[in-house]
Amino acid sequence: MYKLVLVRHGQSTWNLENRFTGWTDVDLTPLGETEAREGARLIAAAGLTFDECHTSVLKRAIRTLNIIQEELDLLWLPVHRHWRLNERHYGALQGLNKKEMSEKYGEEQVFIWRRSFDTPPPALTADDPRHPAHDRRYASLTARQMPLCESLKDTVARVLPYWHETLAPAIQAGRRLLVAAHGNSLRALVMHLDGMSPDEVTGLNIPTGLPLVYELDSNLTPLRRAYLGDAEAAEAKARAVAEQAKAGTTERP
């Protein structure tokens, strides 16, 4: 039996401000740092350890991973950073407030942009300063690999090659992996592992900072998955993610 641990980055500054973040490289809040430390505490209490770590090229995920490593005295572990684990690219919505967009366009439209499987948000234009071509961390990508926006379907298509070519072979070689990534790149992995339909994944919300542990058989079929820590707390944090775009609600601190 293999184990795989997934963790979404701790609260970021734009999570706090309730903005669409996507590939924008924002940092953790003090609460986000605390969430990462608490995630490390839960991992230690469960007796889990790792052989290597994987994350995106965005600092909120990288710093979450680094905090967890430091708390576990595992800063020496190899870390693989890859753009395929980045958050879903929210196109022209990046930087905009979710609640304000709900008030302007309606909650239903914003829900479709956030949670539908195959409907992308409005795209960036090629000359937009937010385009990945203006960021040297993506200098090795082809024009086709640089998104102007992404649906969840597009995000799944981006993430799965990293699963098949990197993560799955490492797990089957007996490596114990910790993956620190983002809400939608992790939704893509969970959808694949659990065989979820597009309708099922629409209702899936990944809470910040809580380690999700998979037990996998020799074919990497899940035998069990569960968040570490209190189940009710995990459900409450997942519900908070779902509430972010509602016009009549306020984002949690």
From Swiss-Prot:
Gene Ontology MF, one: phosphoglycerate mutase activity
Residues involved in substrate binding: 8-15, 21-22, 60, 87-90, 98, 114-115, 183-184
EC code(s) of this entry: 5.4.2.11
CDD domains: HP_PGM_like
Key word Acetylation present: no
Catalytic activity field: (2R)-2-phosphoglycerate = (2R)-3-phosphoglycerate
Residues at the site labelled Transition state stabilizer: H182
Key words, A-Z: Gluconeogenesis, Glycolysis, Isomerase
Entry keyword annotation includes Isomerase: yes
InterPro entries attached to this UniProt entry: His_Pase_superF_clade-1, His_PPase_superfam, PG/BPGM_mutase_AS, Phosphogly_mut1
HAMAP family the record matches: PGAM_GpmA (MF_01039)
PANTHER family named among the record's database cross-references: PHOSPHOGLYCERATE MUTASE (PTHR11931)
NCBIfam families listed in its UniProt record: pgm_1, PRK14115.1
Subunit structure: Homodimer.
Record function comment: Catalyzes the interconversion of 2-phosphoglycerate and 3-phosphoglycerate.
Family: Belongs to the phosphoglycerate mutase family. BPG-dependent PGAM subfamily.
Descriptive protein name: 2,3-bisphosphoglycerate-dependent phosphoglycerate mutase
UniProt source species: Oleidesulfovibrio alaskensis (strain ATCC BAA-1058 / DSM 17464 / G20) (Desulfovibrio alaskensis)
Gene expressing this chain: gpmA
